[in-house]
Amino acid sequence: VTAGRESIATYNEPLAGARKPSWSGVRGPRGVDALRSDGRLLKYVQNVSELRPAGEADDALMAFQHRMCISADDDRIRWPKPPKYDPDDFLLIQRALEASGGSADFFTSLPPAALPGYPGKKKKYCLCCGITIGATDQPSLNSGWASAGWERRKQITDEHTYFELGSFYYLANDPRVPLPVRTSFGKYGLCADEFADYGHVPPQLYVRISNRLVGDAVVTQNSIASPRTKSDSIGVGDWSFDEHMTGKYAVPVAGQAGKLEVMLEGNFWPAIANGSNWYDVPYSVMTPKRG
């Protein structure tokens, strides 16, 4: 098995490996200050010097999250303050609010951007994703997941819960957040009739990718696209090359000595081929590598 990102050279895949932080497809403000007032990096921001050169292999995994079920119903659970909550852990959100002129439109995890997932009268929404600084995706928290034991994986899951609940609590309650934003986020909370045995948070972390089997065949960027049909097909996939962000990095601002801004790294979602996303999955990806 393998984990992390292979290099471009491993399978001749142009999309493989580490990538340069960029604004491609990113929603939200630019020029978000990456530093605390004392010069330290904000929590959840990484130093770009830790990033491998573009195209090289690394151990990064795309961001995990809980697909939380939230509600605007009167019986919703108001955003709970997570244990050991420190508002300064969420200064990245504050910096993004300041860079956007007080607007929270960059935060893509609440309606109208939330995904309606439940029919009927109850106002329920399933949180998902976000190619933005303000998202329930938080890269880097999953570091070491692929080789970790259950105890460490429980810690990683708890760290995601703290980040997610803390972000919403901050947005709905912190006095530094503009009142219209607090009011907007305060209209929502956790569903009272979902996951009650787990504090209304799904017990399962959404692990988008972890260990991968290296079989007799390996599905690669090139093998998916051509040929699209396989003689030993056992199924059909139908999704784009969809990589969620793997890092929020502090990147030097050109011409401004000592100034660092937050940029995202790793996200892309081009179509498989010719604007469509279906592809055959060959049986040989599940059989042991010969030789």
Residue positions per predicted region:
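Flavin (FAD/FMN)-binding glycine-rich loop and adjacent Rossmann-like elements that form
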Residues: 1-291
